[in-house]
Amino acid sequence: MRIESLLQHDVVERILERLAVNSLPRFKAVSKQWKSTIESQFFQGKHLTHRQQSGDPVVLMVTVYNDDSPHVGSLLLGSRRTRNPTTLII
């Protein structure tokens, strides 16, 4: 199953806002929608504002329940201060 079908796009945007600028180019290859989002002026403004106003959340957790199977996916993002900042289980 593709990640775009597991996560709503607004959740994806919130996650992308919290990533370092130098990591964003590789996420443009995930899908046309992600590429379009990352390249939009609106997203770039939100990303810059987020970086200026906060030091990232300690943890952002998204859990996805899929009706087609009992599989549950989780995405955990830590702040820049955590030792193991990203865990993706989907």
Curated annotation (Swiss-Prot):
Protein name in the entry: Putative F-box protein At5g16285
Organism (species): Arabidopsis thaliana (Mouse-ear cress)
Record domain F-box: where: 1-46
InterPro entries with a match to the protein in the record: F-box-like_dom_sf (IPR036047), F-box_dom (IPR001810)
Domain of life: Eukaryota
